[in-house]
Structure formats: structure tokens, C-alpha cells
Design a protein with these regions (language model features):
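Bacterial N-terminal signal peptides that target proteins for export
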Residues: 1-8
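Cyclophilin-like peptidyl-prolyl cis-trans isomerases
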Residues: 19-274
Length: 274
């Protein structure tokens, strides 16, 4: 009787131990491979190893939010999804449910880039969300939704700026603009040649979709103690020859805009490329 009770007790212990949902071994991660790391978008990161579990803890210090493991994850490969909210280097830390660190990896998110295809050529802009997060997020939301397609460069002034993003053929204001954003002009960036800034009215917090590219250094547009200034949020990486070509076009008056190119210059598309 004693031996049978002992056998039954051991069997019960083994049964309880087997119901824990894991293998009982410490998980190990031997490789981390990001498939996509684009600012503002969902990232997919593959974690390879052994005895991996979908209840492990993910820490990114806010650089990649709402982490979750995809249903196709296995004990050999976890598929991590999260939303990228910062640029630059960040540390991805994976812990067990008990808080034991399994792996730390340094990952890098590049600054976002937007490609603008125009009737005169292509322009690539690099944006700076660290300096102007509200402005960059606003611009990307317009670009990624296709808002800028078929809008005009409606204000062209050689030696000053080229401006776009709010009107279609005939200087008709494009519908679908979002609420105005907070002005981020006091961010350390300067209105130098080739930089990109938001256009606005005389009211500081009034920018929506319109933006301009500085054709020359326009330091008087910067923030100062006496001027609200205009928020720079990026710069032209490629295509300053296109900017110069647009700025060189002859202009005239239409619907109150005295600097409208006589030859219509259209943005055919604008989209995030990085």
C-alpha cells in the first residue's frame, strides 16, 4: 500500500509539472532579424532560438509600442510586431515571464523619407521626428493617405520658396484637410536652402497640409523672441535640381495667388519610402 501511494503521488507531481505550458527549459535567443523598421509603421522582428514562449516580456523604452507576438510564432521562432515611434538606436530587451533577461539587442530606426513625384521630376525628403514629432506625423499622415496626389506647386518664388500641398487645378482648395497642428518652430532647425517647413496663416497654430521648400537660406523665417517663425521638419536629400527647375518657372496671378506657375506643376504622388 505504501509503494502504491508513493507511485500515485509521484504521478500527480509529474502531471502538475506538465501543465505549465512550457518545456521547463530556459528559453534562448540566438538571432534577431528585423524585417521592417520604418518610423510610424508596424515593424516585424523575427526572434530565433529555442524553447521560446509567446508570454515573454518585450521592452523597447517606448521606441516600438504595443508589442505582440504573431499567432504563427513557434518555440523556435517568435514573430514580434510593434509600432515604431522613434528614430535612432534603441535596445530591444526580451525577458521571461518571471523577469529574467533572455536577450538584449540594439536596433536602429532610420529617419523617415518621403518621395515626391512631380511633373518635373522626383524629390526625396528626409524628415526629423526627433525635432518636430507633431509636424512629421502630420505630414506623413497626409502623404501615406495619398492626399498630396494631384496637388499643385501653387506658390513659386525664385530666391525664396516653392510651396505646395493644398490646391488642385484652377487653384481649387483640396478637401480632406485635417485639424491644424501646434507650431513646432522652436526646435533648433533652421530655414536653410533645401529644408522643408510647414506653411501657415498669421496664426501660429494653423498649419494643415501645405508645406514649402526653402530655395535659399531664409533665416528670417526662423523662430525668435519676436517672431513665431515657421517649423522646419526635414530637408531635401535628392532632387534639389528639381526644386531649382520649379523655382525657375514663370508665374502669374490666379484666384488671388500672384506666384502661380503659368505651366502647371503637379505632385503626381507622395509616399513614405523609408
Amino acid at each position: 500500500m505504501f509503494h502504491s501511494k508513493l507511485f500515485l503521488s509521484l504521478a500527480l507531481v509529474l502531471f502538475i509539472a506538465g501543465c505549465g505550458g512550457g518545456t521547463g527549459f530556459q528559453p534562448t535567443i540566438t538571432g534577431v532579424k528585423p524585417e521592417t523598421l520604418q518610423y510610424g509603421k508596424s515593424a516585424t522582428i523575427y526572434l530565433g532560438g529555442k524553447d521560446l514562449r509567446s508570454n515573454m516580456i518585450v521592452e523597447t523604452n517606448g521606441a516600438c509600442t504595443n508589442p505582440s507576438f504573431a499567432s504563427k510564432s513557434t518555440t523556435d521562432t517568435l514573430v514580434l510586431n510593434c509600432t515604431v515611434k522613434a528614430v535612432g538606436d534603441f535596445t530591444l530587451t526580451i525577458k521571461t515571464e518571471a523577469g529574467v533577461v533572455v536577450n538584449t539587442t540594439s536596433l536602429t530606426v532610420p529617419k523617415p523619407q518621403v518621395g515626391i513625384l512631380t511633373s518635373l521630376g522626383s524629390i526625396v525628403m528626409e524628415l526629423d521626428p526627433a525635432a518636430a514629432p507633431i509636424t512629421v506625423n502630420n505630414f506623413l499622415s497626409y502623404a501615406n493617405s495619398g492626399f498630396y496626389s494631384n496637388t499643385l506647386f501653387h506658390r513659386v518664388m525664385s530666391g525664396f520658396v516653392i510651396q505646395a500641398g493644398g490646391y488642385t487645378t484652377g487653384m481649387v482648395k483640396k478637401e480632406g484637410q485635417k485639424d491644424p497642428i501646434v507650431l513646432e518652430s522652436n526646435n533648433g532647425l533652421s530655414n536653410l536652402r533645401g529644408t522643408v517647413a510647414m506653411a501657415r496663416t498669421n496664426v501660429p497654430d494653423s498649419a494643415t497640409s501645405e508645406f514649402f521648400i526653402n530655395h535659399v537660406d531664409n533665416l528670417f523665417l526662423n523662430y525668435s523672441t519676436t517672431s513665431a517663425g515657421y517649423a522646419v521638419f526635414g530637408k531635401v536629400l535628392q532632387g534639389m535640381d528639381v526644386v531649382d527647375a520649379i523655382a525657375a518657372k514663370a508665374t502669374g496671378m490666379l484666384n488671388g495667388e500672384k506666384s502661380l506657375p503659368l505651366e502647371e506643376i503637379t505632385i503626381t504622388s507622395a509616399f513614405q519610402v523609408k
